[in-house]
A protein has these predicted regions:
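Short acidic/polar active-site loop segments enriched in Thr and Asp
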Residues: 79, 138, 162
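Short amphipathic alpha-helix that is part of the acyltransferase structural core
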Residues: 26-60
Length: 176
C-alpha cells in the first residue's frame, strides 16, 4: 500500500494594485538573455520547466496527464513566457487573466536551480509584472507558500506586492 505523505504549509495571497514605475534591466549575469512568449508551449516542455523549478518545493497542481495539462495551459487567457540564458531555459512564468475580471494572476514563476543566485529572479519578475499589467488589468495577484524558495516571499514584497490573506493547507509531498 502506498501512503501519501502530506506537508502542512502556510499559503500567502498577495496583490499589487499599481504597476511598478521602473522596469528592471537585465542583470549582468554573464549570459545572453532572451525572454520569449511560448505560444502553444508543448506540454512536455511545460512539464519539464514545472518539474525543474517546482520539484524541490512540492509543486503538484500541474502534475497532470498530458491532455489535461494541454487543456489548462492552452486555454484562452493564459500566457507562458520562458527566459533563456545562452539558449538554455533558465526560468519561466505563467499568467492567467481569464480567471477573474480585472485581475491578472501570476500562476507560476521560477528560476531553474542551476541559474539561481545570479539576479535573474528580480529581472524575470519585473518582466512578468510588465506583461501582466500590459494586458490592461488593474490588479496583479499571486500566491506563495512556506515550501517555496526561501527568498520568494522577500522578492515579492520588495517588488511591491502586499499580503492580503493567509491560510494553512496540506499538500502532497514529492519524494524522490
Amino acid at each position: 500500500m502506498n501512503l501519501v505523505r502530506l506537508l502542512e504549509t502556510r499559503v500567502t495571497q498577495f496583490e499589487m494594485r499599481s504597476q511598478p514605475r521602473l522596469r528592471m534591466a537585465a542583470p549582468d549575469s554573464g549570459f545572453s538573455l532572451v525572454l520569449a512568449e511560448a505560444k502553444q508551449i508543448p506540454p512536455s516542455f511545460y512539464a519539464y520547466l514545472y518539474d525543474r523549478v517546482g520539484r524541490d518545493h512540492h509543486w503538484t497542481s500541474r502534475l497532470l496527464p498530458e491532455k489535461r495539462l494541454a487543456a489548462e495551459i492552452h486555454r484562452a487567457g493564459i500566457a507562458v513566457h520562458v527566459l533563456y540564458a545562452d539558449g538554455a531555459p533558465a526560468g519561466w512564468f505563467e499568467l492567467d487573466w481569464a480567471r477573474k475580471q480585472g485581475e491578472t494572476r501570476l500562476v507560476h514563476f521560477g528560476i531553474l536551480p542551476e541559474f539561481r543566485g545570479r539576479g535573474l529572479a528580480r529581472y524575470l519578475l519585473s518582466e512578468a509584472l510588465a506583461a501582466g499589467f500590459a494586458i490592461g488589468n488593474k490588479v496583479m495577484t499571486l500566491e506563495t507558500n512556506t515550501l517555496d524558495h526561501p527568498r520568494a516571499l522577500q522578492l515579492y514584497e520588495e517588488a511591491g506586492f502586499i499580503a492580503v490573506s493567509m491560510r494553512v493547507v496540506s499538500t502532497r509531498a514529492i519524494d524522490g
